[in-house]
């Protein structure tokens, strides 16, 4: 026989072991209760309803072939319009005229290279209202510009944004490019507040024989360069603004105004001695007596107040002591009467 323990779970409190019953093991299967039937019992199969509707799927057939659309190729027209041919003819005629003239100096090269570029730009802007079809290469223009830039680099740098001025030139002393001046050229006066670097570059290019008309460079270069009559004439013909500006500077550079010294303070006493003492107001003897009497009365009143406070404090202390003694006596009498009873 085999013994096993079967615990009883009915009515067992917490933290208390259930009573043990010794009995023989039964071969019967344990009966599931109604509470545990949902957990351990067999689940009934779920029935899924059939779909009543029908779906027709349309698949593409394999016979049909998808042909991608081809983009139309844009035809490039290489034909040059009439406007481009006219530009080429003008450039060729200018080259022939330049070759007939022969080699020119540096100043003329700088003056002639600029109008070619401007004419090319003007023709391209005026005669091209719409973009040209095809590539039009103006080889002659580019070759000419490259040779001119290689020969005269310094002069072309200065002549890009400034005209060359002279005393005998029209339109305010500025010559148009392409016409060399017979007399020595003179640069214009600088605007106040601007740098003199372009004028120095022009001096290096033109040489030591030519002097600028600006007053600043004339003052600096008096010792280094000789005085020529042409240079003196050009300096006299300088604009009136620069002369006025120079005279204004001279006025400012004069001796400063001298301030008048302030006179010293007049003291009524000597410096070694200090100031005299302050004068007190004059009082009559009657007023002095009245003031002394009022001070005495004030002191007396303060003394009387202190005395009264002391007396009051003493009386209050004595009263409190008397009250305490009376209370103690009453307590003692009450205790003695209670013990006797």
UniProtKB/Swiss-Prot annotation:
Domain of life, source organism: Eukaryota
Name of the featured protein: Putative UPF0607 protein ENSP00000383144
Record field: transmembrane: none
Lineage: Eukaryota, Metazoa, Chordata, Craniata, Vertebrata
Protein family: Belongs to the UPF0607 family.
UniProt feature, compositional bias: Basic residues: 243-252
Source organism of this protein record: Homo sapiens (Human)
Residues in coiled coil: none
Regions of compositional bias (Basic and acidic residues) in chain numbering: 72-101
InterPro entries, sorted: POM121-like_prot_1 (IPR043220)
Polar residues bias (residue ranges): 108-127
Pfam family, one: POM121
Residue numbers spanned by region Disordered: 70-131, 218-279
